[in-house]
From Swiss-Prot:
GO terms for biological process: DNA-templated transcription; symbiont-mediated activation of host NF-kappaB cascade; symbiont-mediated arrest of host cell cycle during G2/M transition; viral genome replication. Residues 68-117 are annotated as: Mitochondrial targeting sequence. Changing residue 109 to A: In expression vector pCMVX. Belongs to the orthohepadnavirus protein X family. It comes from Hepatitis B virus genotype A2 subtype adw2 (strain Rutter 1979) (HBV-A). Pfam families: X. May form homodimer. May interact with host CEBPA, CFLAR, CREB1, DDB1, E4F1, HBXIP, HSPD1/HSP60, NFKBIA, POLR2E and SMAD4. Interacts with host SMC5-SMC6 complex and induces its degradation. Interacts with host TRPC4AP; leading to prevent ubiquitination of TRPC4AP. Interacts with host PLSCR1; this interaction promotes ubiquitination and degradation of HBx and impairs HBx-mediated cell proliferation. Signal peptide: none annotated. This is Protein X. It is found in: Host cytoplasm; Host nucleus; Host mitochondrion.
Amino acid sequence: MAARLYCQLDPSRDVLCLRPVGAESRGRPLSGPLGTLSSPSPSAVPADHGAHLSLRGLPVCAFSSAGPCALRFTSARCMETTVNAHQILPKVLHKRTLGLPAMSTTDLEAYFKDCVFKDWEELGEEIRLKVFVLGGCRHKLVCAPAPCNFFTSA
């Protein structure tokens, strides 16, 4: 069973942040309140970042107060359909990097929740893992191959 998390975009960094859903929130729908983001800092990963908890190979920044800055997608089928085949996300991120009108932060957040994150959480597939980084991530991923930075906008 995959860890229950919710995601939120930090528009100041163009970074998708994941937050573990607390035990008291278990079972609530992902469309509920998302809370607020902490202000990012260069040393966002504390010494005790919780990597020992082993939540499906999340990046070590997953437990920082600023939230993780990389997401290890485990739904290769969904990513092939929505991203690789139609090239939706790379085009959107490229436009945002250039400062051109593109998908709004709210729409992009909904895209991850509805098209990607739901399958990742429910299916828990760990075959043909891919890493998609929005805004760049300086943290190593736990038990993951070298990240595919083709979405990096930094």
